[in-house]
C-alpha cells in the first residue's frame, strides 16, 4: 500500500503540463517542439498509470484501491475522492494508452498546434478523472470538463461541416448531462443523510419508484454517450468531420465513459431498478446491433460506415450488462476495452486513407491496394478484428456475452433464444459490410486517376507503429483473455452478486417488469420460489 497520491498526480499532471504549452518556444511556428512535449507528457503519465497498477493494485481485491480523499469545498460537502477498482482500472489504462497514441497520430497537425495539444492534454486528465473520482458532484464536473476540448477539436480542426457536427455534439452531450446532475442531486439529498460520496449513495435504501426515476435519468445521459439508438445521431456526424486523433479519442475512450457510468451507477447503485430495466437494455442492445449494422451496410461514406459499425458493437455491451451473469458482465467490460482498441485502429486508418485519397466516398476509391500495401494489410487486420475473428479480442468479448446471456436464469428460455438469434444475425451482417468495404477501397474497380496520383503513398513508419501498438493487445487479449479479465473479475463479480440479490424480491412484487416482456416474469417468479 502506498500513501503517495497516485491518481491525483495522474489526473492533474497532463492538465498542469498543458498550461505550460503557451511558453514553449516554437521558432518555425509549425509546432514541432510542442508535439514532442505533448508526446513526452503522454508517455510519462501513461508510465505513471502502469507503475501504479503494477506495484500498488491488488487483482484479488474487488473494492476501491489507490484511495485518496480530501476536503475540497466543505461548505457544500464537496470532497476530492478518487480511487480505482476492477471496473475503472482497465479504462484508466486504456485512456493512457489510446491518448498517447492519439498524440502521435496528430503529428501532421500544423494548424494552431499550441491550442490543439493543450486540448488533447486537458482531455487526457478529464477522462481519467471520470473513471477515478468517487464523488457524484466531482464526477459531473469531470464529465462536463471533457466536453469542451472535444467541441473545440471538432469545431476548429474538423471537416467542411465541422460547426454543425460540433454544435450537435455539444447539444446532445451537454443537454443529456443535466440528467446526471438532477439524478445525482436527488440521490445525494434522499433520506436523512446528504452526501455526494458514491459509496454512501450506493448504501442508501431507496424506494423502488425513486430508483426507477433516477435510473431512467442516468440511462438517457449515458445512452447518449455510449451511444444507444435512438440517441446516437450525433456520433456519425462527429466522426464524419473529426480528424484521425480525435477519432481515436472518440471511439477509444469517450464512448466508454457511458458504459462505465452505466455499470457504476445504474447497476451497482440502483440494483432494484436495474432488474426492472434490464429487459429494456437487452432490447435496446439488439436494436443497436441490427439497426446500426444495416445502416452501416447502406453508408457510402467511409467514416460514417465505421461509425455505425461502432454503434452496432455497443449493443453487446448492453446485453452483457443486462445478463445478470458474471460471464456476461465480464464480456461487456471486455467488449468496451476491445471496442476502444479496434475502433481507434480503424478510425486512424480511415484518416490515413483519407489523407492520401482526399475522398471518403467508396465509389471514388478502388484499386488503391496496389499502391498502399501496408495500409491495405493493416486495414484488413483491424477489420477482421472488428468482425470478431477468432484469436482477436472482439471474438472473445462477443462470445462471453453470448454464453453469459444464453445461460442467464433471469430470463425465460424463449426470450433468450430470440435475443441470441437476433444478435447472431448482427454478427453475420458485420463481415458483409466490412469485407465489401475492403473490396471497394483496395480492390476495385480501379480509379486510375487516383491510383496514379503521386500523393498515393504507402504507410510511413509512424503509422505502422501506431497500428502495431494497437494490434498487440487486440491479439494478446484474443489469445489469452485473462490478461484483461483478471483485472476486473473480482469487481464485476461483486456487482453482479449485488444485482442478483433483488431478483427474487422483484419477482414477488410484480408479474411483469415495467409492464413488458411477459415471458421474463415466469423465470423471475421461479427464482423467487
UniProtKB/Swiss-Prot annotation:
GO terms for biological process: ATP synthesis coupled electron transport; electron transport coupled proton transport. It is an enzyme of class 7 (translocase). It is a multi-pass membrane protein. Its main location: membrane. GO terms for cellular component: plasma membrane-derived thylakoid membrane. The chain crosses the membrane at residues 4-24, 36-56, 91-111, 115-135, 137-157, 169-189, 209-229, 243-263, 277-297, 314-334, 335-355, 387-407, 417-437. This is NAD(P)H-quinone oxidoreductase chain 4 1. It comes from Thermosynechococcus vestitus (strain NIES-2133 / IAM M-273 / BP-1). The gene is ndhD1.
Amino acid at each position: 500500500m502506498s500513501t503517495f497520491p497516485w491518481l491525483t498526480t495522474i489526473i492533474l499532471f497532463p492538465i498542469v503540463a498543458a498550461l505550460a504549452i503557451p511558453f514553449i518556444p516554437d521558432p518555425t511556428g509549425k509546432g514541432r517542439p510542442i508535439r514532442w512535449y505533448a508526446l513526452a507528457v503522454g508517455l510519462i503519465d501513461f508510465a505513471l498509470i502502469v507503475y501504479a497498477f503494477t506495484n500498488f493494485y491488488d487483482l484479488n481485491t474487488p473494492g476501491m484501491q489507490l484511495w485518496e480523499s480530501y476536503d475540497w469545498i466543505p461548505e457544500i460537502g464537496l470532497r476530492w475522492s478518487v480511487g480505482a477498482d476492477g471496473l475503472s482500472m482497465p479504462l484508466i489504462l486504456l485512456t493512457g494508452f489510446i491518448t498517447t497514441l492519439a498524440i502521435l497520430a496528430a503529428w501532421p497537425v500544423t494548424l494552431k498546434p499550441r491550442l490543439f495539444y493543450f486540448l488533447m492534454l486537458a482531455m487526457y486528465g478529464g477522462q481519467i478523472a471520470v473513471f477515478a473520482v468517487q464523488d457524484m458532484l466531482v464526477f459531473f464536473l469531470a464529465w462536463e470538463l471533457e466536453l469542451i476540448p472535444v467541441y473545440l477539436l471538432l469545431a476548429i480542426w474538423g471537416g467542411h461541416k465541422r460547426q454543425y457536427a460540433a454544435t450537435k455534439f455539444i447539444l446532445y452531450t451537454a443537454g443529456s448531462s443535466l440528467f446526471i446532475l438532477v439524478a445525482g442531486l436527488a440521490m445525494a439529498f434522499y433520506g436523512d443523510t446528504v452526501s455526494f460520496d458514491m459509496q454512501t449513495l450506493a448504501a442508501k435504501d431507496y424506494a423502488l419508484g425513486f430508483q426507477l426515476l433516477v435510473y431512467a435519468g442516468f440511462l438517457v445521459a449515458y445512452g447518449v454517450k455510449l451511444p444507444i439508438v435512438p440517441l446516437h445521431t450525433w456520433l456519425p456526424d462527429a466522426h464524419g468531420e473529426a480528424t484521425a486523433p480525435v477519432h481515436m479519442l472518440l471511439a477509444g475512450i469517450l464512448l466508454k465513459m457511458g458504459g462505465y457510468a452505466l455499470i457504476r451507477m445504474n447497476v451497482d447503485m440502483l440494483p432494484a431498478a436495474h432488474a426492472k430495466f434490464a429487459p429494456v437494455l437487452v432490447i435496446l442492445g439488439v436494436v443497436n446491433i441490427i439497426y446500426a449494422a444495416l445502416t452501416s451496410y447502406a453508408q457510402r461514406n467511409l467514416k460514417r460506415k465505421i461509425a455505425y459499425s461502432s454503434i452496432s458493437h455497443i449493443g453487446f455491451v448492453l446485453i452483457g450488462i443486462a445478463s445478470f451473469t458474471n460471464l456476461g458482465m465480464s464480456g461487456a467490460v471486455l467488449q468496451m476495452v476491445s471496442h476502444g482498441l479496434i475502433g481507434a485502429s480503424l478510425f486512424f486508418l480511415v484518416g490515413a486513407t483519407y489523407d492520401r485519397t482526399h475522398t471518403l466516398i467508396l465509389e471514388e476509391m478502388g484499386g488503391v491496394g496496389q499502391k498502399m500495401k501496408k495500409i491495405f494489410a493493416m486495414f484488413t487486420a483491424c477489420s477482421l478484428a472488428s468482425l470478431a475473428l477468432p484469436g482477436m479480442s472482439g471474438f472473445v468479448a462477443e462470445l462471453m456475452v453470448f454464453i453469459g446471456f444464453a445461460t442467464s436464469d433471469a430470463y425465460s428460455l424463449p426470450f433468450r433464444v430470440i435475443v441470441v438469434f437476433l444478435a447472431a444475425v448482427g454478427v453475420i451482417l458485420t463481415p458483409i459490410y466490412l469485407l465489401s468495404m475492403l473490396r471497394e477501397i483496395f480492390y476495385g474497380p480501379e480509379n486510375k486517376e487516383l491510383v496514379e496520383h503521386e500523393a498515393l503513398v504507402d504507410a510511413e513508419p509512424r503509422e505502422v507503429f501506431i497500428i502495431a501498438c494497437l494490434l498487440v493487445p487486440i491479439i494478446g487479449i484474443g489469445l489469452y483473455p485473462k490478461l484483461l479479465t483478471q483485472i476486473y473479475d473480482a469487481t464485476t463479480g461483486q456487482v453482479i452478486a449485488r444485482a442478483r440479490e433483488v431478483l427474487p424480491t422483484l419477482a414477488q412484487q410484480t408479474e411483469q417488469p415495467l409492464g413488458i416482456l411477459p415471458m421474463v416474469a415466469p423465470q423471475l417468479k421461479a427464482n423467487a420460489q
